[in-house]
Amino acid sequence: MKFFATIAALVVGAVAAPVAEAEAEASSPMLIERAGPGGINYVQNYNGNLGQFTYNENAGTYSMYWNNGVNGDFVVGLGWSTGAARSITYSSNYQASGGSYLSVYGWINSPQAEYYIVESYGSYNPCGAGQSGVTQLGTVCSDGATYTVYTDTRTNQPSITGTSTFKQYWSVRQTKRTSGTVTTGNHFAYWAKYGFGNSYNFQVMPVEAFSGTGSASVTVS
């Protein structure tokens, strides 16, 4: 998981910076034997021990509580071993302070890229004003709202294949929400104008946090 450097600098109490090893992240999730609703077949559990992570893959539900603060970065949730331009329906009770996201998250194999469709977040807008090295690409109107689109290049950073240079693509919902449907294809089509490919690696609907406290109970299909 990568965060813009200016956000990392703002996070009080973070160890080094809230940058997780993406390669370890990719190896941490596990395939599940029986698919849940919507074909869910993937459990994302990166540093779930930083809080209390529980899940029921057959029901498409998970919960995470991090009420003692976060000393590091975690990414936990449910999704698919192979991404697609799918519509993802979710509902949640998501409450977070500090640095946290509720998003659709995944990777593209070639050209390698990491992506977020951020539905809600805690105190820090991941692409807020003043972020260095970030290029705004306009807006996408999708699912009844406007998302601001950004890109960023990560140079010699941890990725799903080790250390590499890759792009990040972000769509951040201008009005936060905690339930609804995300039509990922609308974002992918817009990002494709700027080099986003369609060689999908995993795709999940996780909660992520690298500071503060919070809780999330999420249903995904």
Curated annotation (Swiss-Prot):
Annotated InterPro entries: ConA-like_dom_sf, GH11/12, GH11_AS_1, GH11_dom, Glyco_hydro_11
Organism domain of life: Eukaryota
Position of the signal peptide: 1-16
Pathway annotation from the record: Glycan degradation; xylan degradation
Pfam families, alphabetized: Glyco_hydro_11
SUPFAM superfamilies in UniProt: Concanavalin A-like lectins/glucanases
Active-site residue numbers: 114 (nucleophile), 208 (proton donor)
Induction context: Expressed in cultures grown in medium containing D-xylose or oat spelt xylan. Transcription is completely repressed in the presence of glucose.
Localization terms from the record: Secreted
Swiss-Prot/TrEMBL keywords: Carbohydrate metabolism, Glycosidase, Hydrolase, Polysaccharide degradation, Secreted, Signal, Xylan degradation
Domain GH11: 29-221
Record-level GO BP terms: xylan catabolic process
EC numbers, comma separated: 3.2.1.8
GO cellular component: extracellular region
One MF annotation (Gene Ontology) recorded for this entry: endo-1,4-beta-xylanase activity
Reaction catalyzed: Endohydrolysis of (1->4)-beta-D-xylosidic linkages in xylans
The keyword Phosphoprotein is annotated on this UniProt entry: no
Homology family: Belongs to the glycosyl hydrolase 11 (cellulase G) family.
Function field: Endo-1,4-beta-xylanase involved in the hydrolysis of xylan, a major structural heterogeneous polysaccharide found in plant biomass representing the second most abundant polysaccharide in the biosphere, after cellulose.
Identification of the protein by name: Endo-1,4-beta-xylanase A
Upper classification of the organism: Eukaryota, Fungi, Dikarya, Ascomycota, Pezizomycotina
Gene that this sequence comes from: xynA
